[in-house]
């Protein structure tokens, strides 16, 4: 007689408790981009599906955008910064080797004393971060009075964009 396997979905003890986001305020449409490059709105839409994109201004630093998103997630979860045991930031656009973006965010959200590190793995970085966060919670690497991990995916590609080059604009 077959025996039914009983499994849980996900790992016990690890779950998403808050979500936050930040998008730059400036909305740029294809017509504005096309004024700088040899292209058309139709060409861009057909090949990429892009109609608008967000460009960060000088006040919208990578640290500010990541910290704002983290603050919103903490607020939604009802968690304070001093309860955060680790901050993981997935990014490829942080232009400084040190301090890490995660260390800067840790300070901004009031989580000083917790672990902090960046993950540089392009598009997969955030997924790796979520997996590592779940492992940290389940293994007890974070816990006690700091049981939470904040995972952030943040990019500021405006700094790396050549606005006159069709392949990056």
What is each of the regions a protein language model found here?
Residues 85-92:
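Short glycine-rich or small-residue beta-strand-to-loop segments that form or flank ligand, phosphate
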Residues 19-21, 92, 154:
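Cofactor-binding loop segments of dinucleotide-utilizing enzymes, especially the Rossmann-like FAD-
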Residues 2-8, 75-81, 95-169:
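Acyl-thioester C-C bond-transforming condensing/cleaving domain
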Residues 1-85, 109:
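Conserved "HGTGT" condensation-loop signature of ketosynthase/thiolase-family condensing enzymes
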């Amino acid at each position: 007689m077959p025996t039914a396997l009983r499994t849980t979905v996900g790992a016990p003890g690890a779950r998403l408790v808050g979500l936050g986001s930040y998008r730059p305020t400036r909305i740029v449409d294809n017509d504005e981009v096309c004024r700088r490059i040899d292209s058309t709105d139709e060409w861009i839409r057909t090949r990429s599906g892009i109609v608008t994109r967000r460009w960060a201004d000088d006040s919208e630093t990578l640290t500010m955008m990541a910290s704002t998103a983290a603050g919103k997630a903490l607020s939604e979860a009802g968690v304070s910064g001093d309860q955060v045991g680790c901050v993981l930031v997935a990014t490829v656009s942080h232009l400084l080797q040190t301090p890490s973006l995660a260390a800067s965010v840790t300070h901004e959200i009031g989580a000083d004393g917790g672990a902090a590190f960046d993950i540089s793995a392009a598009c997969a970085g955030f997924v790796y971060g979520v997996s590592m966060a779940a492992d940290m919670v389940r293994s007890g690497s974070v816990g006690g009075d700091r049981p939470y991990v904040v995972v952030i995916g943040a990019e500021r590609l405006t700094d790396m964009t050549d606005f006159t080059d069709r392949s990056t604009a």
